[in-house]
Amino acid sequence: MAPLIPRKRHTLRKSETARIHSMLEEEIGESAALFRSDRVEVVSTSAPWSIYLVDRRPLLMAGEDWVFPTLRGIVERPFPERRLVVDMGAVRFMVNGADVMRPGVVEISDDIRVDRPLQVVDERHHKPLAVGIALADAPVIREQETGKCARTIHHVGDDLWNLEI
């Protein structure tokens, strides 16, 4: 991925903030209240997604039809939804940006849906390692024995993780 370069930013209107919040609510339910704020800004960057600053911190990211917390958002305001737990052997691969492989997955939330974002956490400390896009629904992933189950789009140590605004 090319370096993440912030281009410009501006504060969202209340109607836009409400729309972003409702999209976040579709993804993580009632936990979206953790990310409610009077001041939400959007940052234009070189990334293929939008970055939203909540209280001047890059806590949300958005694709074409979804809004989901960044890793920094998950660390600062943890929530239980959309969680894929990987064993400790997968951690070193995840922090380098690898996709999630089924043999390393030990626990799968029931609310994981295909082409929707999810959080990847380690099994021992439950610390977030990555944000990914599910390649299948939760029941299908449970039945799988091999192969990829999520594509990583943001991981610890990448440009978005290190972004300072």
Question: What would you call each of these model-derived segments?
Answer:
Residues 2-49, 53-58, 62-106, 111-114, ...:
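Beta-strand/loop-dominated core regions that host nucleotide or nucleotide-derived cofactor-binding catalytic loops
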